Amino acid sequence: MKERMQKTLAEVKGCPQKDRTESEGYVGVQTFMWICEDNIVEVPFDKEHLLERIISPDNLRKAYKAVLRNKGCSGIDKMSCEQMLPWLLANKDALIRSLLDGSYRPNPVKRVEIPKDNGKMRLLGIPTVIDRLVQQAINQTLTPIYERQFSPRSYGFRPRRGCHDALRGAQKIVDDGYIYVVDLDLERFFDTVSHSKLIEILSHTIKDGRVISLIHKYLRSGVMNKGMFETSEEGTPQGGPLSPLLSNIMLNELDKELTRRGLPFVRYADDSMIFCKSKRAAKRVKESITRFIEGKLHLKVNRDKTIVSYVKGVKYLGYSFYVMKGKCQLTVHAKAKAKMKAKLKELTSRSNGWGYAKRKQKLEEYIKGWVGYYHLANMKRFLIEMDEWLRRRLRMCIWKSWKRVKTKVANLVKCGIDKYQAYLWGNSRLGYWRIAGSYILSRAITNEKLSMAGYATLMGAYIEWHPK
């Protein structure tokens, strides 16, 4: 596979090969390797030759593997990730030549809508797999350059950082006495980024005009929405590998302004919280930082959703905060709890047609994932209550699956219920949910039996994170 990829992504035929003594003349200039079919050629690059670094075979090979690993649906050309390699074998030379001479034109992204928790739709733009390959190559090259510039209080879409780091950072700030929050809400951030402002910010660091031009082409590539082409005058469509990096580059200007003012904050993508020691100070910060965002960055602040509040109960990344004995604690926000319960209800519904094995698998996957994300929260009591509710749901599913009276009676007897009680309950006209909560079904299908059958529990998953 490695040799195949080298042949697929190698380019620059006839590039002159330098010996080691000649390369010593490039003092202070970074180099990369062109892997050709016949030899390895070392080519110098600097800040004005960033494009050569982006399209280097090693970088493109990594980008190819990343796109293949991430999978994802096809773009407007309907090319799948599996079809990418044959296409590259036939068109690699033309692709790299078009990137070098500036004739490369990205395809419009495919509009995809996914529902949000608030009932609205999140708009995604899915690039073609070849555009994803090039975007990924750009992202891999620019990320280490910009990582040196990004704030340590920015956590979204960055290497070795995540939501839990942002939450721990917020806890430390609250522990230092900053107990009032400006919960900043940027209105449709990814859809309203100013292209001219973003290009201006990029130009401060990227001195290779060809790379700036290529990024600009992606920003203005347009959208195919239900077969109709729409221009993209603003925004960085979510869905491509480059969008998260561009959003961080844009909002790094906000980070720098907050740092300059000495204001503690945490930011995960476009989700920011600024902390103050008093409510009056927080209100002043809200007004002044809104002016900066709208005036300098040309972004829109949702004034109705941007709130100033005491830290208790504020929702951030699915968690909420409270202070106990002078220390900031985390709990699961009420909306996240309700969403989890609705999902468990869906997974234990008889209408999905799953058998016992499939239901166990789906429940275990969801429970482990959910508890894995929320394991920072103090939630033992909540999980114990939810486990009781979940076991009742499972008993209801099992009771429903028995269907016929004869089957119900026979299975109750097998589970240790005497024949008379089994006959009474097998013929009962009570609803499924009421019977699932009855003492008879709790005796017949005990917690231990459910556990032995392989049904996962929330507390069981939580104990794996907190063994003591």
Mark where each language-model region is.
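Extended C-terminal regions of large enzymes
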Residues: 393, 402-468
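Short, solvent-exposed helix-loop connector elements
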Residues: 231-234, 345-359, 370-382, 402, ...
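Amphipathic alpha-helical blocks
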Residues: 73, 83-108
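A conserved non-catalytic segment of reverse transcriptases
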Residues: 220, 296-362, 366-368
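Non-catalytic, polymerase-adjacent accessory regions of viral genome-replication enzymes
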Residues: 1-87
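Core structural elements
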Residues: 55, 60, 108-110, 117, ...
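Short secondary-structure subsegments characteristic of cysteine-rich extracellular domains
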Residues: 377-400
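Conserved polymerase palm-domain catalytic core
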Residues: 98-113, 117, 149-313
